[in-house]
């Protein structure tokens, strides 16, 4: 065994062994329990960042741990390789998205291999390849045939100068990123999948996700947003028209003082013909955001339409206002406004001088709505026949009256909207629909799939090449001329079913059901909580679609979900001569000064600039505080980077990158190497004989097996990898202090090292692989079993008992592990220190906490 730890040499040899022996390639095996471990696959942006490394290290730790449990472990990897960044990079680099993407995949693939992740590379997929998206297109046509796909107009960002659709990221301060033209909202036809048809099941099945974080489940419940309410009809005074609104608070109906409708509502369009102010407002709203998040914070504005709604119960007329906070594509495009009991309605009413009436008050007092709306549930008043009813009774009474009079119905609504999957981009999977010469729209026949995306294109930064090339759209279906759809799929489509394709990545069908049902559901899924409401919901939805197509048997795609925290790093900047901030990489900071609490108070970069320190923030390009994993691997080795990632923080919390911590992890591995090196150079011929061990040897062995128990629980059940590492470090401290003078001393240290390299194998696999062989094991560590706790070793012959006299520790005594209270009390009373402090006192009370404490009260 070489004396010095040389990570680059060791890691290269071990990785070559894994590659040559296809160590992590797996097939279905009915005789073994399976375990499918999956980290969210990366977008091939060009280089891995530390967020990737944390995600994939966690996944690899779980996968390797389960492998040593004797399970058949699948851990695949692939590339979420369609998307807008490739188009932007292609424009900037004067290339096409395809070669840029494939080059990035190769580079990042090598980075992943250098980090030692145990992937089954034979299952690698890239979503931009026809072999993958062919089956996505096929499945979309099947969903269309089942009535789960439809086309309708929806709003997009439109640049009138370039005459092209812009992604949200391409709108900067309301203008086109390329030509600075003000962006408009334009209605164009788009394809949708009916996720709302599964809303109830998606909501109810959240209760079955026992292995998912509560925070993610709550976010999904809120996103789906089930509500029970009443849909009711208001007439329009002087017109033979009516419109519907939906409310979850029918108990407040008697307090309606105005109605707000979307600028795009048919009534607003009618009123605008004779109302120039309203017409201008409608045009303005057409070009403003439709994002709910932005609407929540923007100024609430409106214009009176001049129309009046007829209250469905009282017959009273209330004004109809067009308002910028009502969305035509959300609900009915109209809301009843009760400013006495809704704060947004209250503020709008105050702004425009509209009436405010109170109709709900607390059970035990009066209500004051002079400064703010009263939004709690309470008792109805000023509500005619409904006075005195509480929320539930008022809800039911008003709902029943509306239903009885044919003016309303009880209804369950969802906040969730159908999934718009059309994107007016190039670098995505073409949507497999065609329009025949007579205008009929049909799916592309299966024998014409895949609809290939041409990869040899020129990006002009304005229009999608497949939209610009009129010839590309021309095709024939059943002998008829037809035009292809030139929109491409939302890239969430690819990431919604990739996990299932890994089960049979080379199958000449979407999924091989036998293989899919062997591996699925995923046993452990790992990714960021930022995906809670988009990817993770589509992921669940797609699984149910696959189930209903007969391709999988399970109801949910993943049993357990771990959402890892972000990786943070120090962020520094200086102000340049133009007054702009220039962010400086932490690696380029030459000197820092810290206060007595370790906080940075001054920093200078390598060019002598005095820096402003802004604290720890998420590693990002914008703040130039990302740390290149490759630089760290070259400096310290992959095992050190992995160990730091697992030790520095619990997995769900943010991790603060500190190179001093990386150095500490490196020192620990060198300590382990040194201890193993010293041990293999000893005479280790004597086998362990537990019957001959001294009490000190038994105590050391007890620490070994306590550590095995703790690490097993920390990794396997609690997923607290940081405390698992801490437990091994503590055991190492015991071993380094232990004597190595007898054969049994060496035998115990040998047993301990055998356990340690397996306990650490999931985290630092290269050094563990090497040390396992150096310790004299015939087979490789991947073929070994996880260490098993010797329960007998945990049994203590004796206990150390703390003795207190009147609340102060006066002695510590050793007693037999099974000693009863009387025996412990007798031993305590004859201890010389206890006798000293009881001199002249009378014992009044003795309390014994078994195995821990003897407390004597005397006066």
From Swiss-Prot:
Residue spans crossing the bilayer: none
Annotated GO MF terms: aminoacyl-tRNA deacylase activity; ATP binding; leucine-tRNA ligase activity
Binding sites annotated in the UniProt record for ATP: 621
Annotated GO biological process: leucyl-tRNA aminoacylation
This protein's encoding gene: leuS
This protein's name: Leucine--tRNA ligase
Primary subcellular site in the record, as a coarse category: cytoplasm
Reactions accelerated catalytically: tRNA(Leu) + L-leucine + ATP = L-leucyl-tRNA(Leu) + AMP + diphosphate
Organism: Shewanella baltica (strain OS223)
């Amino acid at each position: 065994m070489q004396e010095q730890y040389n990570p680059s040499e060791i890691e290269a040899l071990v990785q070559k062994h894994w590659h040559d022996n296809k160590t992590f390639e797996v097939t279905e095996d009915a005789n073994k329990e399976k375990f499918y471990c999956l980290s969210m696959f990366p977008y091939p942006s060009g280089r891995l960042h530390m967020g990737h490394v944390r995600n994939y290290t966690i996944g690899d730790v779980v996968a390797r741990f389960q492998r040593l449990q004797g399970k058949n472990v699948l851990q695949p990897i692939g590339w979420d390789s369609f998307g807008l960044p490739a188009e932007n990079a292609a424009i900037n680099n004067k290339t096409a998205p395809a070669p840029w993407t494939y080059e990035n995949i190769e580079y990042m693939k090598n980075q992943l291999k250098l980090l030692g992740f145990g992937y089954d590379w034979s299952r690698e997929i890239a979503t931009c390849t026809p072999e993958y998206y062919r089956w996505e297109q096929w499945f979309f046509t099947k969903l269309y045939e089942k009535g789960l796909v439809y086309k309708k107009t929806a709003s997009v960002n439109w640049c009138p100068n370039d005459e092209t659709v812009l992604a949200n990221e391409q709108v900067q301060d309301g203008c086109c990123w390329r030509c600075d033209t003000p962006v408009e909202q334009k209605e164009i036809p788009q394809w949708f999948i009916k996720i709302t048809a599964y809303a109830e099941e998606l909501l109810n099945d959240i209760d079955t996700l026992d292995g998912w974080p509560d925070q993610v489940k709550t976010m999904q419940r809120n996103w789906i947003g089930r509500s029970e309410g009443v849909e009711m009809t208001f007439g329009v005074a002087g017109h033979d028209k009516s419109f519907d609104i939906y409310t979850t608070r029918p108990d407040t109906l008697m307090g309606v003082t105005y109605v707000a409708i979307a600028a795009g509502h048919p009534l607003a369009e009618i009123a605008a013909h004779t109302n120039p102010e309203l017409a201008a407002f409608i045009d303005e709203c057409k070009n403003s955001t439709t994002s709910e998040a932005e609407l929540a914070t923007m100024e609430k504005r409106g214009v009176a339409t001049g129309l009046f709604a007829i209250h469905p119960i009282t017959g009273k007329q209330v004004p109809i206002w067009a308002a910028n906070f009502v969305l035509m594509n959300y609900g009915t495009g109209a809301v009843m406004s009760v400013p006495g009991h809704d704060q947004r309605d209250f503020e709008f009413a105050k702004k425009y001088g509209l009436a405010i009436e109170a109709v709900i008050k607390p059970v035990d007092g009066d209500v004051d709505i002079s400064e703010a709306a009263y939004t709690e549930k309470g008792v109805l008043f000023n509500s005619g026949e409904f006075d005195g009813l509480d929320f539930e009774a008022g809800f039911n009474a008003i709902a029943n009256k509306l239903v009885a009079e044919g003016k309303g119905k009880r209804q369950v609504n969802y906040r969730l909207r159908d999934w718009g999957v059309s994107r007016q981009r190039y670098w995505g999977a073409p949507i497999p629909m065609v329009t025949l010469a007579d205008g009929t729209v049909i799916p592309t026949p299966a024998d014409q799939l895949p609809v290939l995306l041409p990869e040899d294109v020129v990006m002009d930064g304005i229009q999608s090449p497949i939209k610009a090339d009129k010839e590309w759209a021309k095709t024939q279906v059943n002998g008829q001329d037809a035009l292809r759809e030139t929109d491409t799929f939302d890239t969430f489509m690819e990431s919604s079913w990739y996990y299932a394709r890994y089960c049979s990545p080379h199958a000449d069908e979407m999924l091989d059901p036998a293989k899919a049902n062997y591996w699925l559901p995923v046993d452990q899924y790992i990714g960021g909580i930022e995906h809670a409401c988009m990817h993770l919901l589509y992921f669940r939805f797609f699984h149910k679609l696959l189930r209903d197509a007969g391709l999988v048997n399970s109801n949910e795609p993943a049993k357990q979900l771990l959402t890892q925290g972000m990786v943070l790093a120090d962020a520094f900047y200086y102000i340049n001569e133009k007054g702009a901030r220039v962010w400086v990489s932490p690696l380029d900071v030459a000197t820092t000064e810290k206060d007595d609490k370790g906080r940075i108070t001054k920093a200078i970069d390598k060019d002598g600039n005095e820096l402003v320190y802004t604290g720890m923030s998420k590693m990002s390009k914008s703040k130039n505080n990302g740390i290149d994993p490759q630089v760290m691997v070259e400096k310290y080795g992959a095992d050190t980077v992995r160990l730091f990632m697992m030790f520095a923080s619990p997995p769900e919390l943010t991790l603060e990158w500190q190179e001093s911590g990386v150095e500490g992890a490196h020192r620990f591995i060198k300590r382990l190497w040194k201890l193993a090196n010293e041990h293999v150079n000893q005479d280790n011929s004597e086998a362990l004989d537990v019957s001959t061990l001294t009490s000190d040897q038994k105590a050391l062995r007890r620490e070994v097996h306590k550590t095995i128990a703790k690490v097993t629980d920390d990794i396997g059940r609690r997923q607290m990898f940081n405390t698992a590492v801490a437990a091994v470090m503590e055991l190492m401290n015991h071993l380094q202090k232990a004597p190595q003078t007898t054969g049994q001393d060496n035998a115990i240290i040998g047993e301990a090292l055998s356990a340690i390299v397996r306990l650490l194998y999931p985290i630092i696999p290269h050094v563990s692989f090497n040390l396992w062989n150096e310790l004299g094991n015939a087979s490789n560590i991947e073929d070994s079993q996880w260490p098993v706790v010797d329960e007998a070793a945990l049994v203590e012959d004796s206990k150390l008992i703390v003795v207190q006299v009147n609340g102060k520790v006066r002695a510590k005594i050793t007693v037999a592990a099974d000693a009863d209270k009387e025996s412990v009390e007798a031993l305590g009373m004859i201890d010389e220190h206890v006798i000293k402090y009881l001199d002249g006192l009378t014992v009044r009370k003795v309390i014994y906490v078994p195995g821990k404490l003897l407390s004597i009260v005397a006066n």
